[in-house]
Amino acid sequence: MTMPIALRNGFATAATDAGYGDDPRFADWPLDEATNQLDWSLIENWLHRSKHDMAVIAKAVIGAAYGESPIYSYFQGTSGGGRDALAQVQQHPEDFDGIWASDPAINWTKLCAADLWPAMVMKESGNPLPPEKLRVFRRAVLEDFPWLDGSIDHHMAPMHPVQFDANKVVGTVTDVGPITERDAEVMNKIWTGPVNRVGKSLWFGLRPGTESWGDNLVQFGIASTKEVNGVLEPEPFVMAVSYFKTWIFRDPNWDWKTLDTETYLDLFEKGVSEFSSRIDTNKTDLSAFSALSHKLLLTQGAADGAIFPDGVVEYYKVLVQENGGLDTTKDFLRFFLSPGDYHSSLEKGPGINVAEGMTALMRWVEEGEAPDSIQISAIDPQSGQVRYIRSLSSVEAMG
């Protein structure tokens, strides 16, 4: 997505399909359907190898074309690309002088399994929540915490979700009937996230106040529903279904509706146990990256409805703790948590645009000026006009 922008601004730029090629499958590509086995060579390409090869080859081509190698090299990625960015930091720290990881899809096993949780809650309760009711819950949260949507000037989003009990909304009238206690129970479970039999949290839930039903530019949400023969049914996120179908069951014909809560929880932990160390891209030892004086810009939308923000917040906290604390990590890391910003800035909330983010990163790498604040802008999705601009402080600047 950023390649045309880079080219228009005079940069040499490169991309890779990671060996995926013209496979028509959107998310089931790791499965070799001829053998019903995972293709680990292709998975290694996806995890890190292809981006490293791209960097090496691109620099050689640039050197041949221009007679000299690039002075500075940068990597920017969002979502899966954000995961790619952190894979470069962790696995190939020498490849890029500056890296921007935005809304990174790390903690892959927990993320994908947890993305199925809202649909599981609605299915198992027999009580899917239509958009009309989800809007009421969100509106109630924003009435109590109006700065969550980013429209009120706020230095940064909180590092933890606000506390809100969905039962406060019970009785509120909507176009599809009043909010019931069952509705509130479903909403609270979605916000809490998956919890195992002994009450241990398996992963985070959606933050209260997050748009989660597809009222955004790409009509995507992990708490979506659809009508089938006049009956409302949960519609799970395709990546979540694919994770179970491909990684867990290795069956392209598997039907998620056959899954009950107990089995889901067992398989959640099984997937983490079996695959986490290989594919989660959450290594926190960045000493090699730091030693090279390379710079990492880590950004996350606090209203992300696809990548649970608290998973990235947790990664950041552990990273800082295990790399000597803020006094050490501030030399190579800045973290920005944007209030009201949806996944990849696909909603109305304010986010860091490519120009602001890359300019800040380049200035840090090339001039030594660390970005303690970055301008964020809210764009009207219909008109493309800027609705407002705010200044977002880094977590480091806020102490």
Kindly give the residue locations of the regions a language model identified.
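C-terminal His-loop and adjacent cap/lid subdomain of alpha/beta-hydrolase
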Residues: 1-399
